Amino acid sequence: MEPIRNLAENLRAVLGRLRDGEPRKGDMFNGQHFWETLGHSIKATSQEATKLSLAFTKPPLPSEEGSQKLCDGLLNAILAAATVYYSLPKEQGITLRKTVREAIADVIEGTIQLVEVILSSRIQSLSQAQLVSTGSVWEACDQWEKLPKDNLAAVQVIVSGYLDVVKDAIEEVEQAQTDGEDPFSDIPEDDEIGARGNQDTYWSEADRRLMAPCLGLMKASKACLKKVIGAIKAHGKADTAEHVAQLDDLVDVTQEVSPSVDELALSMYPPMNHATVRLNAAKLSSVLKKVLAITRSSHVCPEAESTWIQFLDSAVDHNMQKTKNLTQGAL
């Protein structure tokens, strides 16, 4: 099993270099050649992983030489995919590079898992774990066909993901509000601790008043991301280095929105600390202001269509001011 152990070590080394490596400098980038070559190497990886898995499903197991050949075939296919990734220049977009890198990393991680299952298995038959691991490699390999092919498409996918997280946070807070006076009503009473009469599990009237502008900020976050995505779809371009860089800037700034929304949402649950809520609301407000400013200065927002920026900017100010007014006593 020495070739299998060596394969696992080599794959971990490839994974480490993949995440730390820089793009290779070379000739003019050829997009069609890049995607075709990547597709071939990913397909080869899937085939070689299947061969390796099948070879260790039942006796007789491969000889040392046979195992080495199988391992070499799989390692070479993965090295080919990593090499193709290195040919993708930064000028094509940081977001696109990260998307491709993570897709290849998923393939390598799935393959490492498969190899480790083979190493740990003492039963010479197709185990459930081996079956699942092989399927995971296939699934990761199949994802390459769905990858965005330029930075514009990659940015749309990423920012849409941020929007989904924000939507979930808003739904959870609204659900908690509609569940009644006690947001923890599903928690049973404890005879030793006592009834759920503890005020720490309830929103006070002051809490509920403060929730309104905070939820307003969260909804402004949702509207902001939706508008940014719409602007990217309508006006986004990946035709020049400047446009590509501006799209990457939008990803960088919008990625701060969902964590800020989550922080605010968590601080809104009882027992509510109004000073903490105010601080988190201010953080979110600052992030949204930055998103709007960077969007306004980019090519995705023509001057003639910037009214939504002004509207959302005012909405953020309005809700933040209400939050401040309701938390004066907490300072």
Curated annotation (Swiss-Prot):
Residues 175-197 are annotated as: Disordered. One of its GO terms (cellular component) is nucleus. Its main location: cytoplasm. It is found in: Cytoplasm; Nucleus. Keywords: Cell cycle, Cytoplasm, Nucleus. Residues 175-192 have a biased composition (Acidic residues). Belongs to the CCNDBP1 family. May negatively regulate cell cycle progression. This is Cyclin-D1-binding protein 1 homolog. It comes from Xenopus laevis (African clawed frog).
